[in-house]
């Protein structure tokens, strides 16, 4: 699948740890989100996940089937070997994950690559790497979804990072229904969320509100 910045508009991130390690519930919520209009899904099995390596592959293959059915790109967080095993469309790499250059060499042109950047220096460095397709910036606000989350960067820095970046930017971290518009209005290409969707009492309506921002 060829990368398109529009893929970033309604970008759902998650793993079984986000639904109390209930695999069935996880797949049900992901599929409902796909039916409702998310534009990308990132498989992120971290934190309190209880899945063994082989179970991660099996679940990844089920996600691959769902993403293909709904025409949505499947992105894997950090683990490029898992991404290759399940034929993912992309891989997302954090500053503290596997070295971005190593990932680029491993996946070549088989997948698009996202890279987390939270400072102007990190963005400027990313601008020099032609193999990076998009940048993830955050957490914009404090978040409980990631146990290893950095300090919140705030709206002003997000806006600055978006201006500096030569790649499309997706914002993540602490985004909710109250602040999603102010995040969108910074000019970012998309919003990435975890708990906003997985914890929503009306998942369909939540996804539609996000989609409406980019109409």
Curated annotation (Swiss-Prot):
Mg(2+) binds at residues 78, 97. It catalyses: 2-[(2R,5Z)-2-carboxy-4-methylthiazol-5(2H)-ylidene]ethyl phosphate + 4-amino-2-methyl-5-(diphosphooxymethyl)pyrimidine + 2 H(+) = thiamine phosphate + CO2 + diphosphate; 2-(2-carboxy-4-methylthiazol-5-yl)ethyl phosphate + 4-amino-2-methyl-5-(diphosphooxymethyl)pyrimidine + 2 H(+) = thiamine phosphate + CO2 + diphosphate; 4-methyl-5-(2-phosphooxyethyl)-thiazole + 4-amino-2-methyl-5-(diphosphooxymethyl)pyrimidine + H(+) = thiamine phosphate + diphosphate. Pathway: Cofactor biosynthesis; thiamine diphosphate biosynthesis; thiamine phosphate from 4-amino-2-methyl-5-diphosphomethylpyrimidine and 4-methyl-5-(2-phosphoethyl)-thiazole: step 1/1. Keywords: Magnesium, Metal-binding, Thiamine biosynthesis, Transferase. 2-[(2R,5Z)-2-carboxy-4-methylthiazol-5(2H)-ylidene]ethyl phosphate binds at residues 143-145, 174, 194-195. PANTHER family: THIAMINE-PHOSPHATE PYROPHOSPHORYLASE (PTHR20857), THIAMINE-PHOSPHATE SYNTHASE (PTHR20857:SF15). HAMAP family: TMP_synthase. This is Thiamine-phosphate synthase. It comes from Limosilactobacillus reuteri (strain DSM 20016). The gene is thiE.
């Amino acid at each position: 699948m060829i990368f398109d910045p529009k893929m970033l508009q309604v970008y759902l991130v998650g793993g079984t740890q986000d639904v109390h390690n209930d695999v069935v519930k996880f797949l049900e919520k992901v599929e409902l989100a796909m039916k409702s209009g998310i534009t990308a899904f990132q498989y992120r099995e971290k934190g309190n996940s209880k899945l063994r390596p082989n179970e991660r592959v099996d679940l990844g293959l089920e996600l691959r089937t769902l993403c293909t059915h709904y025409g949505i790109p499947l992105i894997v967080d950090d683990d490029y070997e898992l991404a290759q095993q399940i034929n993912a469309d992309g891989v997302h790499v954090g500053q503290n994950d596997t070295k971005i250059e190593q990932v680029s060499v491993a996946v070549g042109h088989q997948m698009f690559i996202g890279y987390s950047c939270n400072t102007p220096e990190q963005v400027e460095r990313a601008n020099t790497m032609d193999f990076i397709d998009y940048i993830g910036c955050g957490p914009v606000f404090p978040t409980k979804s990631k146990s290893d989350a950095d300090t919140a960067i705030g709206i002003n820095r997000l806006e600055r990072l978006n201006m500096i970046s030569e790649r499309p930017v997706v914002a993540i971290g602490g985004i909710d229904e109250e602040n999603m518009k102010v995040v969108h209005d910074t000019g970012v290409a998309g919003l990435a969320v975890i708990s906003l969707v997985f914890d929503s009492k009306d998942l369909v309506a939540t996804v539609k509100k996000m989609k409406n921002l980019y109409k």
